[in-house]
Structures are given as C-alpha cells and as structure tokens.
Amino acid sequence: MTLKRAFDVAGSCAGLLVFAPVMAVVIPAVLIDDGRPILFRQRRLGRYRRPFSILKIRTMRDGSPTRVGRILRATGLDEIPQFINILSGEMSAVGPRPLTESDVARLGWTGPDFDSRWDVKPGLTGLAQIVAPASPQEALELDRTYAVRWNPWLDCRLIALSFAVNVFGKARVQRAVASWRD
C-alpha cells in the first residue's frame, strides 16, 4: 500500500466517522424534502480514463435544485458519500475533479496531449477546485501540475486549504493563495 493510499484510507474512514452525525440529519432532510432516492450515482472518468460511479447526495429533481439540495450544494455536504469512493479506491482525497465523458468531449480533453491529467486518481478536492481557474485551459494546466508535482506535502496543503475554503469562504482563501504567488 502506498503512502497516498494509506492516507486516503485513513482519511476516508475518519471523514465517514466525523460526518456520520451530519448524515444523520441530512438523510432525513432529503427524505422529507423530496423523498427517495437519497444517493445519486453518475458515471465519471477516473485514473487512466477508467469509468466509475461517483456517489453524491441527490440535490436535484427534474433539473432544478431542491430546497435542501441548495444548502447541501452550497456547503459541499452533497459530496460526503465520495468518502466511500475514496475508500473503495476509485478516488483519492486530493486529485483532479472527476469529469463525465461528455465533459471531456465538450472540453476536447482527449488524446495523448492530455494523458498526464489522467495519471492520478480524481479527488474530492484538488488544486483546480481551490484555485477556481478562469478557464477550462487553466483548470487543465492546474490538473497537469498536480499530476506531475504530486507529493504528500502538497496533498496536506491542499486539504488544509479546502478546510479553509469551507470555514472562511472561497474568495478570502483565493486572495490569500494569490498573494502567495506574488
């Protein structure tokens, strides 16, 4: 087991335990607001473009967000089930955003020029998710940068920044990150 995988297993177990009380509130809220199903599965592309089913809490009905869904999406709580994807080895805690096949086709991210982006597992959080790039091309460059420069310290920093985004807000954290670049 690699260091990254050990970190992912420990982190996803901890995440599932920490968020269990939250899920005890979220699941009944989704049921009351809009009924079943609770979980939403969607086919995404993982490492080496292998498809997998990503898990999320369902937040939409007929293309519109539900009342509870708006809150879950705004807080990122709809992504808690992805700890199961991490535990099963389909995702990592940190990595590029998992994309759908239609996203990849729409963005034109196919062919050997884009292979480095797919050399790592997709993540619950990542460099592009935190930086919030201005364009898909910039997002791709951030994904490639992560894939090439990965190290345990980078993952730790990105996880810390993800927590900061959730506590302080994305705009404040992005200003702080931008000041580090200067």
Regions found by a protein language model. Give the residues of each.
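Juxtamembrane helix-loop transition sites at the ends of transmembrane segments
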Residues: 29, 42, 97, 106, ...
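Short, glycine-rich, amphipathic interfacial segments at transmembrane boundaries or analogous
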Residues: 37-74, 124-142
